[in-house]
């Protein structure tokens, strides 16, 4: 059985870990980094992921996608999406089904399709480390993700060629990473998770007793559209406003300038966590009729804190709600864990310390803890980790729309999962032969104010006066937090089942098509990699052969020289094309054409070696320098 890997699919950065000798290990990617920027770029002939994609973003802003997680499982008309439409350098569009999609070079793509490229990079990173194929994964999501967002994340895994064995909440994963080595006692832990695009708070009880550990989530709350990207956007808007005041030009209309501004804002924000002031200096940021313009703005930590103060305050209300839902007071919290890169900001740490009345722990890596926890959960599923029980919850209430456009809840928020619930409903009209089951997720009484997860009809109900037919609706939430619904006419036994997909979302056919596309791209990518290797080898051969021709001088006959130069020219032409076979053929032709060169080079090397040996024999040096002179002869031979 192959390894199950743990993946933290983050808004800003992603991370992959695996159990290695019973311990979770974060795996370095091909660039040698332990985290990978969640950035995907589409060029003419390839898809670039991670740090290489980030490096080229300034020159390719409209085809470089970041923070895609903020769009996953969302509708285009959502207020949060509309805010992003106005500030992102790439194009966010409404799909035919109403979902938020993106567009690159005329191709429309669903967020799970784009996110799958990051998951593929994580999969390849793990495979390179393990030396074997990886097909199974545990993927983390924000605790406050709704059903649509969880389903979309599983879809991304399928498109990437992964069987997603479990979806696990990020704060729960962080608690696993923190608590797995705490062998005794009962601890109540608050996990404050402020990442790149989402915020979660989870109250978790860790019970360690005689080697058995139970991680029970007591309550969770959060905001799926609040994170480091919003902090960056405040800084971006401030810099753009300052530039407009100074120069009268609005940088928001220039995607290239906005991409440079984004990078500078993120860098300045990070610097201000360890220093009190910094300067953003972007020469040639734009130009007008009078010439090029430069942006130079000094910014202090105090200014940044004033720009984001309300964002930090927005994280505190969910803390109060989560404590109330868990029926706990602040004094009941034993430890506070910070997760997510944005928690490195001193003002965030100060706000959390003031709220809980205690310093957060510093021994949890905010960038890696979630992936480590996912790897531990993977170990639990594979049987490698024993005596660990994880009890997670559903973050939002689930129910159906009933008469008067009211949401009737079947499963309350913070219910431990997996779970089932059923309730009997009846008809609203006389002789009604069908009922529509409209499934909702949220906390509002008014049905329309909640998230619609989908609807289906139960038909064939026998005509009867209103209120007499009995329809049993059953909700079943699996361990991934994904909902399955059935409705049964108790008299006839007729039943209708669905696994809830959002009223939008991707159909199975669309996901399968994307899986096939991804597999086709994998072949394309492999061929492209082979082409690049062939080009590089050929280029190196052409360069070294030219040098050898020069060094050979008159020792090389003119007809031989012409033959070699013609072969070099043919190879250089082939390198510019995209035909690997043509490059390989031209490479072999040059190797054969330059056989005479090799003879000349070998003869020259042999002559030099004999000359040096003769010189060494003529001169009898002292014993203590013989070894050094012998070394010199060897080096020359090389």
UniProtKB/Swiss-Prot annotation:
Q: Which domain of life does the UniProt lineage start with?
A: Bacteria
Under the heading PROSITE patterns, the entry gives: HSP70_1 (PS00297), HSP70_2 (PS00329), HSP70_3 (PS01036)
Q: Which PANTHER family match?
A: HEAT SHOCK PROTEIN 70KDA (PTHR19375)
> Where is the PTM Phosphothreonine found along the chain?
198
Induction per the UniProt record:
By stress conditions e.g. heat shock.
**Gene from which the chain derives:** dnaK
> What is this organism's lineage?
Bacteria, Pseudomonadati, Pseudomonadota, Gammaproteobacteria, Alteromonadales
Keyword Plastid tagged = no
Matches recorded under InterPro entries: ATPase_NBD, Chaperone_DnaK, Heat_shock_70_CS, HSP70_C_sf, HSP70_peptide-bd_sf, Hsp_70_fam
Write one Gene Ontology MF term: ATP-dependent protein folding chaperone
Native species of this protein? Shewanella frigidimarina (strain NCIMB 400)
Provide the function of this protein: Acts as a chaperone.
Residues of the region (Disordered) are 539-559, 602-638
Instruction: Identify the keywords attached in UniProt to this record, alphabetized.
Output: ATP-binding, Chaperone, Nucleotide-binding, Phosphoprotein, Stress response
Instruction: Please report the name of this protein according to its UniProt entry.
Output: Chaperone protein DnaK
């Amino acid at each position: 059985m192959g390894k199950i890997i743990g993946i933290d699919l983050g808004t800003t950065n992603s991370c992959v870990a695996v159990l290695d000798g019973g311990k979770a290990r974060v795996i370095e990617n091909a660039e040698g980094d332990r985290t990978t920027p969640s950035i995907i770029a589409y060029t003419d002939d390839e898809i670039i992921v991670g740090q290489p994609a980030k490096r080229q973003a300034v020159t390719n802003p409209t085809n470089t996608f970041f923070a895609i997680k903020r769009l996953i499982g969302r509708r285009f008309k959502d207020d949060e999406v509309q805010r992003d439409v106005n500030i992102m350098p790439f194009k966010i569009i409404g799909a035919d089904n109403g979902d938020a999609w993106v567009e690159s070079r005329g191709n429309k793509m669903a967020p799970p399709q784009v996110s799958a490229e990051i998951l593929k990079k994580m999969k390849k990173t793990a495979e390179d480390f393990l030396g074997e194929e990886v097909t199974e994964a545990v993927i983390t999501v924000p605790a406050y993700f709704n059903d649509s967002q969880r389903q979309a994340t599983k879809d991304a895994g399928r498109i990437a060629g992964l069987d997603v064995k479990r979806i696990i909440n990020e704060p729960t994963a962080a608690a696993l990473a923190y608590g797995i080595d705490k062998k005794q006692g009962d601890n109540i832990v608050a996990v404050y998770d402020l990442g790149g695009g989402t915020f979660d708070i989870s109250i978790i009880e860790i019970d360690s007793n005689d080697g058995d550990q139970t991680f029970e989530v007591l309550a969770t709350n959060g905001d799926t559209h609040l994170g480091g990207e919003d902090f960056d956007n405040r800084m971006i808007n401030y810099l753009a406003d300052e530039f407009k005041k100074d120069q009268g030009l609005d940088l928001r209309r220039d995607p290239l300038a906005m991409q440079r501004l984004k990078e500078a804002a993120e860098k300045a924000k990070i610097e201000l966590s360890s220093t009190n002031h910094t300067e953003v200096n972007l020469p040639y940021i734009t130009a007008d009729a009078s010439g090029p313009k430069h942006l130079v703005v000094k910014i202090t930590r105090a200014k940044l804190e004033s720009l984001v103060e309300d964002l930090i305050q927005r994280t505190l209300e969910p803390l109060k709600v989560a404590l109330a839902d868990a029926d706990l007071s602040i004094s009941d919290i034993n430890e506070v864990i910070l997760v997510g890169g944005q928690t490195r900001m001193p003002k965030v740490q100060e706000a959390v310390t003031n709220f809980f009345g205690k310093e957060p722990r510093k021994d949890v890596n905010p960038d890696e803890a979630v992936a480590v926890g996912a790897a531990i959960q993977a170990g639990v599923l594979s049987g490698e980790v024993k005596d660990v029980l994880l009890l997670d919850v559903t973050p939002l209430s689930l129910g159906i729309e009933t008469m008067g456009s009211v949401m009737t809840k079947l499963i309350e928020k913070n219910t431990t999962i997996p779970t089932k619930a059923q309730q009997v409903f009846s008809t609203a009209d006389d002789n009604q032969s069908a009922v529509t089951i409209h499934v909702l997720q949220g906390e509002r009484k008014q049905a329309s104010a909640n998230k619609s997860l989908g609807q289906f009809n139960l038909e064939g109900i026998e005509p009867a006066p209103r209120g007499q037919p009995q329809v049993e609706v059953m909700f079943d939430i699996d361990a991934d937090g994904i909902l399955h619904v059935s409705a049964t006419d108790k008299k006839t036994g007729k039943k209708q089942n669905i696994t809830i997909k959002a009223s939008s979302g991707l159909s199975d056919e669309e996901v399968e098509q994307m899986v096939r596309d991804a597999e086709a791209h994998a072949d394309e990518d492999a061929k492209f990699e082979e082409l690049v290797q062939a080009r590089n080898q050929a280029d190196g051969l052409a360069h070294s052969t030219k040098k050898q021709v020069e060094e050979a001088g008159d020792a090389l006959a003119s007809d031989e020289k012409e033959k070699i130069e013609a072969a070099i020219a043919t190879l250089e032409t082939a390198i510019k094309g995209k035909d690997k076979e043509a490059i390989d053929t031209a490479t072999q032709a040059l190797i054969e054409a330059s056989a005479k060169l090799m003879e000349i080079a070998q003869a020259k090397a042999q002559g030099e070696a004999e000359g040096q040996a003769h010189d060494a024999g003529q001169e009898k040096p002292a014993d203590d320098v013989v070894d050094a002179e012998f070394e010199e002869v060897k080096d020359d031979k090389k």
